[in-house]
């Protein structure tokens, strides 16, 4: 019986990553019908569909598992072939990491700095909410993910990194305008705030846990940028929950005020990665865990 042909999975990967059969054919230098035939052969071999044929095409659950396998094999091949063939000029090892925006804005880039400068690596840092990054690892879309979840998924390990501490801050002018009589449920309802996106529950959790303010009572802008949070707070347009690590100098200079010094939101974050790591992926995991533990409260 014929085994699994990786050209079939390669075709699936191209269709999913490029978003169409036509662009996948261009990438693989074969006809569009040949791409379709390879995926049909894969589905016949597995006796189940691997692709949801809509625009853009999406992998089924089985398809996602196959893509995870394929990308692992590609990563191992990228690292192993130059070693076996003594090739000096090869393409960098390509890998994707899922991270939340706040980690990227504070400690993640310094953690990766040495590896990016010393190794032939092409990193794709994709941003998702902390509760969603692990889904990307499950689907095989990334080789590692920063997540709130302490439990590793099958075939992966989870390393504790530290605590992300969030302070509720505003400019002195904003504070005087909305909170001159104190930070109370009434004043919090009147003042405009900021959240990252529709999945961001951080602000709502803070207001409910400490002030019993329900989410439907809050004026809440949505801005998909951690750096923009700081700019909005500094401009006096809103108050925000911002990582302490991101605004140390602003707090020291008085440009921002910690509105609730008695209350702080803190939660643990974890680095999830494949168990069987080698080469540059192992170096990345070691760099992330070591640096995070040196700058994040433990």
UniProtKB/Swiss-Prot annotation:
Short name of any one Pfam family annotated for the protein: HTH_1
Keywords: DNA-binding, Transcription, Transcription regulation
GO molecular function: DNA binding; DNA-binding transcription factor activity
InterPro entries to which the protein is assigned, alphabetical: ArgP, ArgP_gammaproteobact, LTTR, LysR_subst-bd, Tscrpt_reg_HTH_LysR, WH-like_DNA-bd_sf, WH_DNA-bd_sf
GO process terms (BP): regulation of DNA-templated transcription
Database matches in CDD domains: PBP2_IciA_ArgP
Gene3D superfamilies per the UniProt record, alphabetical: 3.40.190.290, Winged helix-like DNA-binding domain superfamily/Winged helix DNA-binding domain
Top-level lineage group: Bacteria
Domain HTH lysR-type: 4-60
DNA-binding region, residues: 21-40
Coiled-coil region list: none
Protein's job: Controls the transcription of genes involved in arginine and lysine metabolism.
Assembly mode: Homodimer.
Protein family (similarity comment): Belongs to the LysR transcriptional regulatory family.
Identification of the protein by name: HTH-type transcriptional regulator ArgP
Species: Vibrio cholerae serotype O1 (strain ATCC 39315 / El Tor Inaba N16961)
């Amino acid at each position: 019986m014929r085994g699994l042909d990786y050209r079939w999975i390669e075709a699936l990967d191209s269709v999913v990553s490029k978003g169409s059969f036509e662009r996948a054919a261009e990438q693989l230098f074969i006809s569009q019908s040949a791409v379709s035939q390879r995926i049909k052969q894969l589905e016949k071999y597995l006796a189940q569909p691997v692709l949801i044929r809509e625009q853009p095409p999406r992998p089924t659950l089985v398809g996602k598992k196959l893509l995870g396998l394929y990308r692992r094999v590609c990563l191992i091949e990228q690292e192993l072939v130059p070693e076996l063939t003594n090739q000096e000029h090869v393409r960098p090892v390509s890998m994707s990491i899922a991270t939340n925006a706040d980690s990227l804005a504070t400690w993640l880039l310094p953690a990766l700095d040495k590896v990016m400068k010393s190794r032939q690596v092409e990193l794709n840092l994709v941003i998702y909410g902390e509760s969603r990054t692990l889904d990307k690892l499950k689907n095989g879309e990334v080789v590692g993910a920063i997540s709130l979840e302490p439990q590793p998924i099958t075939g992966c390990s989870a390393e504790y990194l530290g605590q992300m501490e969030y302070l509720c801050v505003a400019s002195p002018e904003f504070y005087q305008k909305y909170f001159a009589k104190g930070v109370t449920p009434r004043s919090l309802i009147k003042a405009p705030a900021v959240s990252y996106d529709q999945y961001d529950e951080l602000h709502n959790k803070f207001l409910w846990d400490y002030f019993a303010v329900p989410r439907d009572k809050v004026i809440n802008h949505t801005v998909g940028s951690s750096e923009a949070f700081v700019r909005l707070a500094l401009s006096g347009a809103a108050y925000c929950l911002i990582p302490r690590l991101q605004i140390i100098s602003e707090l020291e200079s008085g440009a921002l005020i910690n509105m609730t010094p008695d209350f702080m939101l803190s939660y643990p974050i974890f680095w999830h990665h494949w168990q069987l790591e080698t080469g540059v992926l192992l170096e990345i995991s070691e760099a992330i865990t070591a640096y995070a533990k040196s700058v994040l409260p433990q």
